[in-house]
């Protein structure tokens, strides 16, 4: 354990930041799972709405430094591909 006051403060801040980032990461994963579950259920409107809600969450995760911008782009692309595949399946 740190003895210097500034090191103690940094340890406290690191713990607070870790907990905060964990909550944000959990929220991100939850929104991604909502899209996947909606697509798997076969409900197109629900899947599209879940995707619309997930995109800003993914983008804000990049701005907060939780994930890399390429990972965000990849996630959005894959989710969008699932939704579009469901739309094509529903149309035919």
Curated annotation (Swiss-Prot):
Summary of the function given for this chain in its UniProt record: Binds directly to 16S ribosomal RNA.
Key words of the record: Ribonucleoprotein, Ribosomal protein, RNA-binding, rRNA-binding
Native source species: Methylococcus capsulatus (strain ATCC 33009 / NCIMB 11132 / Bath)
Positions of transmembrane segments: none
HAMAP family: Ribosomal_bS20 (MF_00500)
Pfam family, one: Ribosomal_S20p
Cellular component, GO, one term: cytosol
Family the UniProt entry places it in: Belongs to the bacterial ribosomal protein bS20 family.
UniProt GO BP: translation
Entry protein name: Small ribosomal subunit protein bS20
Region of interest: Disordered: 1-20
Domain of life where this protein originates: Bacteria
InterPro entries xref list: Ribosomal_bS20 (IPR002583), Ribosomal_bS20_sf (IPR036510)
GO MF entries: small ribosomal subunit rRNA binding; structural constituent of ribosome
């Amino acid at each position: 354990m740190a003895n210097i006051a500034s090191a103690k403060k940094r340890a406290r801040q690191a713990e607070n930041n870790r907990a905060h980032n964990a909550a944000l990461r959990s929220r991100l994963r939850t929104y991604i799972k909502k899209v996947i579950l909606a697509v798997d259920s076969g409900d197109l409107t629900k899947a599209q709405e879940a995707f619309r809600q997930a995109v800003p969450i993914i983008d804000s995760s990049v701005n907060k430094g939780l994930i890399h911008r390429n990972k965000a782009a990849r996630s959005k692309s894959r989710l969008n591909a699932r939704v579009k595949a469901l739309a094509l399946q529903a149309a035919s």
